[in-house]
């Protein structure tokens, strides 16, 4: 019987620290529910002491998730630990993850504490966290650059104090696989009480080695890996959940562990996170990129047709790629739509949400002859995106015009706090004109940081997905929109971002570098 490798997902905490990836409370809950479908063991939902918004997000995830452990991050200080404990109180299974830096440069320059003081603080933090839960994780921040003897000392003390998981972070992505694997080997063999805790790896991808380092740690005895969907994270990102899971699953001849992850939900999780954060997945990304299971070479194509395993080491269906491309059309009824949603793993909390999605589907089917799985997923994402709490702005109508030699124009009507208002503008293109017309009505004062468009499927009638990123006074939000008309999709995305920008529930939080 293989040992279980615990999958600890930190998309909602460390992943959100990627500049521009900030999420609303509702978006975090949606992602958490998908992670629960994926059967992730632990969901790190946020940093409760960072802000009231983050506290409420962790609390909301703790209430919504039933089958995964919900974790809150806390520095080794009283307020952080208390806030984390309060935030996870409603969880069926809760964990507090507390940390303090242990590398010489961090202790001297950042903490201004002696090694003895750091050990004392670590012990206190673990004991204080256990006042709220028996499930306590301790991280020696920047462990990869810490002195081995001191690292052993502080970890032994933390386990004695009651830590049940010891996480070893390569905070700045400095380690290489052989070195990181050897570190785990040393820790597990030198620390007398190492068998009393699960050892975990948390790697950053600054040198492109996050997954390799994590797998090296697993080979040396780590039994938890901290990761994010799509490898999302600050700087170059974190360990990609989908890559670790499928590496372990595919190479059962090499690894002595397996995970409980329900892999057919991987692609849905990837698309949801990409859609909400606005961080598109590159086509050649392992497991979830659109080219991950494509074969251009004639020799490869011939081999795959004769026997799949000649050039494919895993099945596309095992991670959620559908072999059934064309699914529905304009004559499809509600029951067929509901059935296909179920096959795609898409669920709605209320019949009204299903009805709204079906109406959107019928509208799309009138404009698009063939409806694909990707269209349905984009349509549902678009509907969820527009379901914003305290919605202030809503698109009512949009008319654009362009002619060679003349400036493109746009006339837009918005519903603003219960009243319809209309404005027109010219621009360098129809999208530019549309955004300028919107600004005539709302005067947001925000700066457009990113505008990107991607097609959901092939063909000129494909749904287009648009992402905009806006910044105002240090706050960054993402907006998404989807439509067969790319200008309409752009307007939807811009309006979605504006609604988030004026939502006072959104927050700006300090970075936690674990």
UniProtKB/Swiss-Prot annotation:
One Gene Ontology biological process: L-leucine biosynthetic process
The EC number(s) this enzyme carries: 2.3.3.13
Source organism per UniProt: Hydrogenovibrio crunogenus (strain DSM 25203 / XCL-2) (Thiomicrospira crunogena)
Principal EC category: transferase
Chain positions recorded as Mn(2+) binding sites: 14, 202, 204, 238
Subunit structure: Homodimer.
Function: Catalyzes the condensation of the acetyl group of acetyl-CoA with 3-methyl-2-oxobutanoate (2-ketoisovalerate) to form 3-carboxy-3-hydroxy-4-methylpentanoate (2-isopropylmalate).
Entries under SMART domains matching the protein: LeuA_dimer (SM00917)
Protein name in UniProt: 2-isopropylmalate synthase
HAMAP family: LeuA_type1 (MF_01025)
Keywords: Amino-acid biosynthesis, Branched-chain amino acid biosynthesis, Cytoplasm, Leucine biosynthesis, Manganese, Metal-binding, Transferase
Principal location class: cytoplasm
Record GO terms (molecular function): 2-isopropylmalate synthase activity; acetyl-CoA C-acetyltransferase activity; manganese ion binding
Domain Pyruvate carboxyltransferase: 5-267
């Amino acid at each position: 019987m293989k040992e279980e490798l615990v999958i600890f997902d930190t998309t909602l905490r460390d992943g959100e620290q990627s500049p521009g990836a900030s999420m609303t409370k509702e978006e975090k809950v949606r992602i958490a529910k998908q992670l629960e479908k994926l059967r992730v063991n632990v969901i790190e939902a946020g940093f409760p002491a960072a802000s009231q918004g983050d506290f409420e997000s962790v609390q909301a995830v703790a209430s919504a998730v039933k089958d995964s452990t919900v974790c809150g991050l806390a520095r080794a200080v009283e307020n952080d630990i208390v806030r984390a404990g309060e935030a996870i109180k409603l969880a069926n299974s809760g964990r507090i993850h507390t940390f303090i830096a242990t590398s010489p440069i961090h202790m001297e320059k950042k903490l201004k504490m002696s090694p003895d003081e750091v050990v004392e603080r670590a012990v206190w933090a673990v004991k204080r966290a256990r006042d709220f839960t028996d499930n306590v994780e301790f991280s020696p921040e920047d462990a990869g650059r810490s002195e081995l003897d001191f690292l052993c000392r502080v970890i032994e003390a933390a386990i004695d104090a009651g830590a049940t998981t010891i996480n070893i972070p390569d905070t700045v992505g400095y380690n290489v696989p052989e070195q990181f694997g050897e570190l785990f080997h040393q820790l597990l063999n030198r620390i007398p009480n190492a068998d009393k805790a699960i050892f975990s790896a948390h790697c950053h991808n600054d040198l492109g080695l996050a997954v390799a380092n994590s797998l090296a740690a697993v080979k040396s005895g780590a039994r938890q890996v901290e990761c994010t969907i799509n490898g999302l994270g600050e700087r170059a990102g974190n360990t990609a959940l989908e890559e670790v899971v499928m590496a372990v699953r595919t190479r059962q001849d090499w690894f002595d562990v397996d995970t409980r992850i329900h892999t057919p939900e991987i692609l849905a999780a990837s698309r949801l996170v990409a859609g909400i954060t606005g961080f598109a997945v590159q086509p050649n990304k392992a497991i979830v990129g659109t080219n991950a299971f494509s074969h251009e070479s004639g020799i490869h194509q011939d081999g795959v047709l004769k026997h799949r395993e000649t050039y494919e080491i895993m099945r596309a269906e095992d991670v959620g790629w559908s072999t059934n491309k064309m699914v529905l059309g304009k004559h499809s009824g509600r029951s067929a739509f509901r059935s296909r949603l179920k096959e795609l793993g898409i669920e709605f909390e209320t019949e009204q949400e299903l009805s709204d999605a079906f109406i959107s589907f019928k509208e799309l089917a009138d404009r698009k002859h063939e409806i694909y799985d990707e269209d349905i997923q984009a349509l549902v994402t678009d509907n969820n995106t527009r379901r914003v709490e305290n919605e202030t702005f809503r698109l009512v109508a949009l008319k654009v015009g362009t002619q060679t030699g003349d400036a493109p124009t746009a006339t837009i009507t918005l519903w603003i706090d219960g009243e319809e208002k209309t404005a027109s503008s010219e621009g360098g293109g129809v999208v530019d004109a549309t955004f300028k017309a919107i600004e005539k009505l709302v005067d947001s004062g925000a700066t457009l940081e990113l505008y990107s468009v991607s097609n959901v499927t092939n063909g000129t009638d494909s749904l287009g997905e648009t992402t905009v990123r806006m910044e105002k006074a240090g706050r960054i939000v993402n907006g998404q929109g989807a439509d067969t008309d790319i200008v309409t999709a752009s307007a939807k995305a811009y309006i979605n971002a504006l609604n988030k920008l004026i939502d006072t529930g959104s927050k700006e939080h300090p970075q936690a570098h674990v």
